Amino acid sequence: MVRSPTAEDIRSAYRLLLGREAENETVVENWQRLGSFDQLREAFLASSEFKGMRPGAPSATLVPLEAPPIDVEWQTDAANGAALLAHVRAVWTRLGTERPHWSVLSAERFQPENISESTREFYASGAQDAAMLVACLKRHGLAPAQFPRMFEFGCGVGRVTPYMAQAFRQVTACDVSASHMDMALGIVKGAGLDNVTLNLVQGAEFGMTGAFDLWFSRLVLQHNPPPVMAMILRRCFSLLAPGGVAAFQMPTYASGYRFEIAPYLQEISNAGGIEMHVLPQPVVLKIAAEYGCFPLEIWQDGAAGNTAGWVSNAFLFRKQAAHTAMNFSLGTNFRTGG
């Protein structure tokens, strides 16, 4: 009979593998839901924190504070917005069909020819995302029970969704790839979860059709052009309930990065791989302020990889109980486009 890890087993794993104590008891409880020692071990060994501790592991280099501004065109009209979204859908429909797991976590062991040996590790890694979110809430005296309607933007093949469904009363998740969604549905049904709804992203609603109390996205927004990122955030903040929280990650700076809509649209017919994009931090703050959302914390994380010159931020916003738009002006580097 397989014995599930106890709370003390989890604490010991933290001490032995990460050299520290667990953040709090909520994190310990989330790890216990993995159900087996094999899953626990694989999730810890696959974590970015453990990998960063290994001798010779690449370390992120901080971008200096004197870094120059970047030129990003982030607003557009409806026609160009639809063209950009159609491109994103085409890319991810193909990736979701050809290399579904690798398109979510781009490691060689998750390529189609290797996934049979690493499926358990792949899905176990989703526990870390849920644990990070719960810990993030905990730092501000908040708990999942306060946010019954949770929305996961970019659920992929269902790597994280089951863990979110264990922590939140009702979970709605979406993705732009139909093949991803089919696989996510299989994971949800296989786990016997009856509190999950899956929406396919088909237009400017981005799969968000009703209000929610908490919005979460990680390793997703960065693969969308800046105008699409901005459109997604506007939709998110507009539907976030008063007092609700938005927790998400995206790159906000990259040395030498530049984005112009017209040249990009002219070249997308030749593109087809995974793209990495940036939405500058002042733009994120401006959009949030327009919908009465204020930052609780902004952390620099390593979610964009250890590529030199890149900055990725983990944001936590909360919407005011009474929506009051806040004024926020931008400098000339952030253009509205047409």
Question: Which ranges hold each PLM region?
Answer:
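A short acidic, Gly/Pro-enriched loop at the edge of an enzyme's catalytic core
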Residues: 206-215
